[in-house]
From Swiss-Prot:
InterPro entries, per the entry: Ribosomal_uL14, Ribosomal_uL14_bac-type, Ribosomal_uL14_CS, Ribosomal_uL14_sf
Residue ranges of the TM segments: none
Signal peptide stretch: none
GO cellular component: cytosolic large ribosomal subunit
Subunit structure: Part of the 50S ribosomal subunit. Forms a cluster with proteins L3 and L19. In the 70S ribosome, L14 and L19 interact and together make contacts with the 16S rRNA in bridges B5 and B8.
Organism: Lacticaseibacillus paracasei (strain ATCC 334 / BCRC 17002 / CCUG 31169 / CIP 107868 / KCTC 3260 / NRRL B-441)
Protein name per its UniProtKB record: Large ribosomal subunit protein uL14
């Protein structure tokens, strides 16, 4: 579960390497987010020459969490790291490549472009 002040690895080539969560979107008292949730974050580490710069405020969708997510069949999906993909206002990714696997739960949240760019969908 991702909450305020959580640091996430960025799983795309938008130029950001690490982001810090400012807010989990979806309600005024929402405390935590899981796979497929949108967060507002600031860029803490960035590569030179990238699309996004350090200290930019961006929106991102969570694609991997250590705590995992429960599926309808009762199974759980967990990853080794917490990661997100930076998105535009229309929920399309800012980068052109996605690194690492993403969860199947992203299909339900209108993130098909991220699912199609990902090398592996678990």
């Amino acid at each position: 579960m991702i909450q305020q002040e959580s640091r996430l690895k960025v799983a795309d080539n938008s130029g950001a390497r690490e982001i810090l969560v400012i807010k989990v979107l979806g309600g005024s008292y929402r405390k935590t987010g899981n796979i497929g949730d949108v967060v507002v974050a600031t860029v803490k580490q960035a590569t030179p020459g990238g699309v996004v710069k350090k200290a930019d405020v961006v929106k991102a969708v969570i694609v991997r969490t250590k705590s995992g997510a429960r599926r309808a069949d009762g199974s759980y999906i967990k990853f080794d790291e917490n990661a997100a993909v930076i998105i535009n206002a229309d929920k399309s990714p800012r980068g052109t490549r996605i690194f690492g696997p993403v969860a199947r739960e992203l299909r339900d949240g209108d993130f098909m472009k991220i699912v199609s760019l990902a090398p592996e969908v678990l």
